[in-house]
């Protein structure tokens, strides 16, 4: 909060117990080097506090296993498996569907390309339109590359790989089919979800837990390979549905949140700040009005605007579940937790009203950690 060095004094009157909450992974994919850097750094600090300073640490780490990314990836993997079972060979129908998927992917993610770009012209045109990015520069060629350019490179690779698979001369053997799907699946995944995602029976939570359990296990394996200590306590969002509902009800009762007609509940930033001493966006106040970060924080499935929000900056504490999304019972109707409220509930349940240390990725300071 102070962005400076301060003396560390535990809440414990005897100065021995340190309560620490570490924001854990959202388990929809494998961990990457950014995760490794984060959790190894936290582990070093944890070992120093316990081993050198002799504090008695209570280290809690969560697993986010309900999230827009998880819902999308779980649905997509389910739909792709079903699609592959119905299309075990590369037919004209499969090719045509994949071309449509390619076109949709390029249109959404690579807007500098012309509307008539196709699998045959993709490499040449993308090389021209995104030359600066390919050369390691910013899109406009003025400044250095950043996160935006990294995502563009990912999209270029995905589309290029799919184009190569579609242009491959032979697709007849089982090995050819495997190679085709390996190259095309990243454009097929979002396309199939756009067609059939809302038709999935989301009451069957195994569509999603099959994904999260797999990647939680892989994350733990990676951390142990890096010699990162296991948490003392692990919490999972799926195990906290009732507590989250109760927590949100208290916020509504306190006058800091409101429900909308679709069954969602939003935090009322203006109402919160009307109370003397309450301030919002303490970690990165300069990002308070960043609509891009706000949208990222709300998730890919929550981009539809509602006129009932009192402010565009108000964020979801509880989201009404749409077709194809998992749901839990609540006073506002079937829904699921908003991303930002989850850690508040789990941390307070295990550690109480106050904690000594809260750690997590710097990229999520605003809006996630500020909630």
Stretch-by-stretch model annotation:
Residues 1-371:
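NTP-dependent nucleotidyl-transfer catalytic core
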